[in-house]
């Protein structure tokens, strides 16, 4: 694996390999001594594995880390843990033949490594690392803010707030900071659209459920949105909400404007369904997905918050939404949940009967 990766990187005129670690222990030492612009990390290594190495690097000497892992169930679980610990991106190799494998994902790998090398802000991931490690060890949700909760409503004849969280690069660690605020009786439906392959989102839902009180599930076609549930958009599919509040999944259209899933498609459908009861959180990520969708929510009378540059791993998606004039509030990572909750509870307190 190391030799294959080194060959790919050395063949690129914009990249230079400055070190090669045989295990996690050496990776930690080289990160400290060489201070590279970016690190690629395997999960399965002797002595100290990729998870331990990622946690230590992000705690003591933060560097942008790109995980290289398999698409297996075990590979997905380990990769997601590494992202929670502060790795900012990953490349999933689809088979077991390493050389052929890496050639098949070569362009994706190079694109993500080049992008990671430009990341300026990594302190957010570093700050999260110790908190998440403790939570992983205890297997209990992180404490949620105390607030007045209102009983959720149900039924297709009801209207209730719908929150869309949109994230790409750096998203899993960022969502880990926000998700503990949501509780089982949160009076809104929450949809999370994270740019992620199909093989990963089922495992992502299972792992995210460990850190929050709200019900977490991978979204299913034709199910009705319900308050008190966080729906994760399945990888490789676009998620839309119909006029009757049902989830529509589209796995045949391919990429829309370069993205699969496409965040704009989800937000635009939520704006049409929930109108002024819609809320969007545009989080860290590269590109402009979510900008036009956020504009649709704002135009419909909903609230749009964007993560600020100081706490974003990549200030791409939030910046594009701000440029589009779609954002009401630009907030740090620790203030985003409170803004969403304030809006949701305000809607529930003022909405007439049958509209909540």
Feature locations, PLM:
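Conserved acid/base catalytic micro-environments in cytosolic active-site loops
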Residues: 1-14, 20-26, 32-40, 44-356
């Amino acid at each position: 694996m190391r030799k294959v990766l080194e060959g790919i990187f050395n063949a690129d005129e914009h990249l230079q390999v400055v070190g090669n670690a045989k295990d996690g222990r050496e990776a930690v030492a080289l990160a400290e001594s060489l201070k590279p612009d970016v690190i690629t990390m395997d999960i399965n290594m002797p002595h100290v594995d990729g998870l331990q190495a990622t946690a230590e690097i992000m705690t003591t000497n933060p560097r942008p880390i790109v995980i290289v892992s398999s698409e297996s169930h075990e590979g997905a679980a380990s990769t997601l843990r590494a992202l929670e610990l502060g790795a900012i991106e990953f490349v999933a190799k689809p088979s077991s033949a390493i050389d052929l494998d890496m050639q098949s994902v070569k362009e994706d790998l190079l694109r993500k490594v080049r992008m990671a090398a430009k990341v300026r802000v990594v302190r957010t991931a570093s700050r999260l690392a110790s908190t998440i490690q403790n939570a992983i060890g205890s297997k209990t949700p992180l404490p949620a803010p105390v607030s007045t909760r209102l009983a959720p409503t149900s039924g297709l004849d009801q209207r209730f707030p719908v929150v869309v969280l949109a994230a790409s690069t750096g998203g899993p660690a960022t969502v880990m900071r926000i998700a503990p605020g949501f509780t089982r009786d949160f009076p809104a439906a929450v949809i999370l659209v994270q740019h992620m392959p199909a093989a990963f989102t089922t495992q992502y839902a299972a792992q995210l459920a460990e850190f929050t009180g709200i019900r977490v599930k991978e979204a299913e076609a034709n199910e009705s949105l319900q308050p008190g549930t966080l729906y994760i958009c399945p990888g490789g599919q676009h998620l839309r909400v119909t006029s009757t509040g049902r989830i529509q999944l589209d796995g045949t259209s391919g990429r829309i404007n370069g993205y699969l899933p496409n965040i704009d498609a989800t937000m635009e459908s939520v704006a049409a369904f929930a109108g002024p009861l819609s809320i969007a959180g545009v989080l860290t990520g590269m590109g402009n997905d979510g900008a036009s969708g956020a504009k649709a929510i704002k135009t419909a009378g909903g609230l749009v918050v964007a993560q600020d540059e100081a706490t974003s791993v990549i200030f791409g998606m939030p910046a594009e939404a701000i440029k589009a004039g779609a954002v009401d509030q630009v907030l740090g990572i620790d203030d985003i949940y409170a803004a969403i909750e304030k809006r949701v509870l305000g809607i529930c307190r003022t909405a007439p009967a049958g509209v909540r």
